[in-house]
Amino acid sequence: MAEAQIDSQLLDGARRALVRHGWEGATLQRLADEAGVSRMTLHRRGVSREALLAALGEQLEHEYREAFWPALTAPGTALERLELALDSLCDVADRNLELMEALGHAERDLVFHERKRPALTKQVFTEPVQRLLADGVADGSLAVEDPEETATVLFNLVGHTYRHLRAGHGWSPKRTRKAVIDLALRGLVAR
């Protein structure tokens, strides 16, 4: 079968359908309705729910890469740049809060986790954090034994906790960022 033809109109519609109906309720008909196309158009373009999920995952990968870039290229210690990266992670989480809440665990796993078990978070999401952790070990600002594993822990610690406190507890972005990032960084600072 040919690769699905998914444009920004379909992705935006998929986001709306997922937010409104959740993954289980986001039928192809609802996805088509939210995108302003017919279900037959989705069929002709080779679009399935799974293809839309994969495309949304690619969109998230791009958003995280773009968000982390300034922290990778900024001046300062690795600790300062890591704080900037974690703040950027919170920015992406805020922009995608409703989408992430609408996806089930299995769908989030497909987007973020490696397939093997035990799994790390996909490198496309954690590689920038891993780089900053390794830089911190090199410049003495961070105490980290395994940057690769710590990057997965940190990405998930900040991402999940931030999302939960924002969506589940109704905390403001400012309050949540300070609480989560300060706590996460305290465990990494070289003493």
Predicted regions and their residues:
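C-terminal peripheral helix-coil segments that are non-catalytic and often amphipathic
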Residues: 91, 123-138, 156-157, 163-191
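Hydrophobic alpha-helical connector segments
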Residues: 55, 69-95, 150-154, 174-177
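Amphipathic alpha-helical packing segments from all-alpha helical-bundle domains
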Residues: 62-65, 112-139, 148-152, 163
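Helix-turn-helix
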Residues: 5-9, 13, 17-51, 55
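Amphipathic alpha-helical segments used for helix-helix packing
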Residues: 93-113, 167
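Short amphipathic alpha-helical elements of helix-turn-helix/winged-helix folds
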Residues: 13-17, 88, 92, 157
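Short amphipathic alpha-helix in the helical subdomain of ABC transporter nucleotide-binding domains
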Residues: 3-6, 10, 147-154, 173-177, ...
